[in-house]
Amino acid sequence: MSDYILGIESSCDDTSAAVIKDGFLLSNVIASQQVHKDYGGVVPELASRAHEQNIVPVVSQALDKAGIKASDLTAIAFTRGPGLLGSLLVGTSFAKALGVALNIPIIMVNHLQGHILADFVKQEGKENHHPSFPYLCLLVSGGNSQIVKVNGPLDYEILGQTIDDAVGEAFDKCSKMMGLGYPGGPVIDRLAKLGDPDRFKFAKPQIPGLDYSFSGVKTSLLYFVRDEMAKDPDFMEKNKEDICAGFQKTLIDILMDKLIKAARQTGVKEVTIGGGVSANSGLRSRIEEEGRKRGWNTYLPEFKFTTDNAAMIAIAGWFHYLAGERTPLDIAPVSRIAYY
């Protein structure tokens, strides 16, 4: 008998629902919120209200595209955290209510675990490649920057993480600082392709071990732009491509230096990336380049699985389901959560 898992993702500003059948993706529906662009970042209250409006039609579309009825579902996987509490509450409450109505189990999932396991989402008609255990995952997003050693589907070891800002936050804040808009990652990536990455240099932090820090890079860019704009008010407009190229190269260098060190220390040759920043073209090219140079087997998630989506929540939930794990109905969402 086949297992149909409904995944629900609502940790930030994307409402998503997906259905998998025995690990194969049948549908993945995402409703993104455009209202936050006007504010230069996600407004939690607006995000949770939009989730309330989107959750029912998004789940309905996911079931329709999968060609099944709600009564065919085996279990419901949902994001418990980390994320915005108001947004998480919408997805958690819906999952609990639907689980009770259908008399099927619910399964809580760590949002970051979903990103880590995104490569395991199988699709009909495609070659489905995923890393072998153990593997290293460079997890990079707006809220997190970590190097995780993945020993098994439910066995994680954090080797290093940011001690201040996440790399995605650095992209967003510096894009706003330069007047390039939100979200910053795609804009900076696009402009960086047109610029000289070696023309402008920015400070790199000297953090021991495998931890990251990105606050100093932001400060370095801030002072640089401020000083140059004082000399020439048009400096930013004249040089934005080169500034973006240099800034992006600095961030990628920081990320890769620690990942290379982690691979050397652990001896692990299976390497993947996950999270929203894993869509960055410069980072994807660099990790493939380093992989060829160092004999790594590298895995890059499809672009549709880099941003927040329910397919990754469904596959993570499926692994929990196979392990016999179930979540009680008195569970509540949390903004911060450990791997489990």
PLM segments and residue spans:
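Short beta-strand scaffold segments in enzyme catalytic cores
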Residues: 15-20, 137-139, 145-149
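N-terminal beta-alpha supersecondary unit
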Residues: 3-82, 111, 243
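Conserved phosphate-binding catalytic cores of ATP/NTP-utilizing and phosphoryl-transfer enzymes
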Residues: 1-2, 109-135, 316
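Glycine-rich phosphate-binding/hydrolytic loop that grips phosphoryl groups
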Residues: 115-117, 301-340
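Conserved phosphate-binding/catalytic loops in two-lobed NTP-binding clefts
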Residues: 108-109, 288-313
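Glycine-rich phosphate-binding loop plus the immediately following alpha-helix
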Residues: 151-194, 218-219, 223-227
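Short Gly/Thr/Asp-enriched flexible loops that form oxyanion-binding sites at enzyme active sites
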Residues: 78-103, 121-122, 281-290
